[in-house]
């Protein structure tokens, strides 16, 4: 047991340091191609690169370990100090991804066939997960790798709607203008705005507004973007119609949309992850998340799915991203124990 732990931690140091050294903000995932080619050769895992998204698929099988290789922007020089590794993506989600790669390698060595994916664009519009759903892939089980503190199993995510609104008006000299597009639209924003308060209540949040071209002329055009979040028990169409009714004189376009997801606590992946943690004397928690993940998309190609991963979720997207190699080991062990159970019952 101790020998296996040291092997996993040593391999994690090597692989995670390599991957953190490669800058892969969304849409730049091809930077990691040589890394995945090396993994494929070293671990004897077949490599497929999805052509449209540049997502990486390793191995074969009916069970998928799915994480993502892209990060938010902002490179952080990786370093290791006292069994802690720092760098952009250490938590979200290169740490979970490396845990999955090591788990897949060890499982395949035991004859348990598992696929692992480093999907693209999760931090943007999830084109990697979307491409996977369009390629006729279907899996008996999927575990999504996102930081969940090494103890939490995510069974629910909210959905999102990204809305662009374009408004127009007659420009006037600002010294004598009778109307102002900025003022008029600002009033409507305040009326439709729903502050994020709790999970079950939807939020409608303006995130971008652009208008005006001259210091002394009221704007002729205004661009506005809303980020809408809603739980599975909220009515999507009601939210869209509420915004449409408020901005009747403007054009509205849905530029991206992700459905909410909620899975039964009795689905096989949830139960196997729960038992895997209990076997390590770790008390699992079933949680729901206010954001979205690739789980929202990948629910289309399986009936058994949940999200779990090592890493402190409070450090996601911060300049303090770090993860310990003990956390990585717990992640590897949890994935392996869960998949061994799922494999035996298949």
Swiss-Prot record:
Q: In which pathway does it act?
A: Amino-acid biosynthesis; L-lysine biosynthesis via AAA pathway; L-lysine from L-alpha-aminoadipate (Thermus route): step 5/5; Amino-acid biosynthesis; L-arginine biosynthesis
Q: Which UniProt keywords apply?
A: Amino-acid biosynthesis, Arginine biosynthesis, Cobalt, Cytoplasm, Hydrolase, Lysine biosynthesis, Metal-binding, Zinc
Enzyme kind, highest EC tier: hydrolase
The note describing how and how many cofactors are bound reads:
Binds 2 Zn(2+) or Co(2+) ions per subunit.
Keyword Cell division assigned = no
What subcellular compartments does it reside in?
Cytoplasm
Q: What is its EC number?
A: 3.5.1.130, 3.5.1.132
Q: Which GO terms describe its biological process?
A: arginine biosynthetic process via ornithine; L-arginine biosynthetic process; lysine biosynthetic process via aminoadipic acid
Quick one: where is this thing mainly located?
A: cytoplasm
What domain of life? Archaea
Picking any one GO molecular function of the record gives:
hydrolase activity, acting on carbon-nitrogen (but not peptide) bonds, in linear amides
Q: Which reactions are catalysed by this chain?
A: [amino-group carrier protein]-C-terminal-gamma-(L-lysyl)-L-glutamate + H2O = [amino-group carrier protein]-C-terminal-L-glutamate + L-lysine; [amino-group carrier protein]-C-terminal-gamma-(L-ornithyl)-L-glutamate + H2O = [amino-group carrier protein]-C-terminal-L-glutamate + L-ornithine
| Positions annotated as active site in the UniProt record | 70, 122 (proton acceptor)
User: Binding positions for Zn(2+) 2?
Assistant: 92, 123, 317
> Under the cellular component aspect of Gene Ontology, which terms does the record hold?
cytoplasm
Q: Which cofactor does it need?
A: Zn(2+); Co(2+)
Per UniProt, where does Zn(2+) 1 bind?
Answer: 68, 92, 146
Against Pfam families, the record matches this protein to:
M20_dimer, Peptidase_M20
Which NCBIfam families has this protein been placed in? Answer: dapE-lys-deAc, PRK00466.1
Similarity section: Belongs to the peptidase M20A family. LysK subfamily.
Q: What does this protein do?
A: Catalyzes the release of L-lysine from [LysW]-gamma-L-lysine and the release of L-ornithine from [LysW]-L-ornithine.
| Official protein name in the record | [LysW]-lysine/[LysW]-ornithine hydrolase
- What lineage does UniProt assign to this protein's organism? Archaea, Thermoproteota, Thermoprotei, Sulfolobales, Sulfolobaceae
């Amino acid at each position: 047991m101790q020998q296996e732990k040291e092997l996993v931690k040593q391999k994690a140091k090597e692989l995670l340091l390599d991957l953190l050294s490669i800058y892969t903000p969304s849409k730049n995932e091809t930077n990691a191609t040589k890394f995945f080619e090396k993994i494929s050769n070293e671990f004897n895992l077949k490599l497929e690169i999805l052509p449209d998204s540049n997502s990486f698929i390793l191995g074969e099988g009916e069970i998928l370990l799915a994480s993502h290789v892209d990060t938010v922007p902002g490179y952080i020089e990786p370093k290791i100090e006292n069994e802690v590794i720092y760098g952009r993506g250490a938590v979200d989600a290169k740490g979970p991804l490396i845990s999955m790669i090591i788990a897949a390698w060890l499982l395949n060595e035991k004859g348990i066939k598992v696929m692992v994916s480093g999907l693209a664009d999760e931090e943007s519009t999830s084109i990697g997960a979307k491409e996977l759903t369009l390629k006729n892939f279907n899996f008996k089980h999927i575990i999504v790798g996102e930081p969940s503190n090494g103890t939490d199993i995510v069974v629910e995510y909210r959905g999102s709607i990204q809305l662009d609104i374009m408004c127009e008006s007659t420009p006037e000299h600002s010294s004598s203008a009778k109307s102002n597009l900025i003022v008029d639209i600002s009033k409507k924003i305040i009326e439709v705005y729903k502050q994020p308060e709790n999970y079950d209540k939807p939020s409608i949040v303006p995130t971008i507004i652009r208008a005006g071209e001259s210091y002394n002329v009221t704007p002729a055009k205004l661009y506005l973007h809303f980020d809408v979040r809603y739980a599975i028990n909220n009515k999507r169409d009601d939210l869209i119609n509420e915004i449409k009714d408020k901005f009747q004189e403007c054009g509205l376009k849905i530029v991206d949309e992700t459905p909410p997801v909620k899975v039964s606590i009795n689905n096989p992946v949830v139960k196997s992850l729960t038992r895997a943690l209990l076997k390590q004397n770790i008390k699992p928690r079933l949680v729901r998340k206010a954001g979205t993940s690739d789980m929202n998309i990948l629910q289309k190609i399986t009936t058994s799915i949940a999200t779990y991963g090592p890493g402190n979720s409070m450090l996601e997207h911060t300049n303090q991203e770090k993860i310990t190699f003990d956390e990585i080991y717990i992640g590897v062990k949890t994935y392996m124990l869960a998949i061994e159970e799922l494999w035996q019952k298949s």
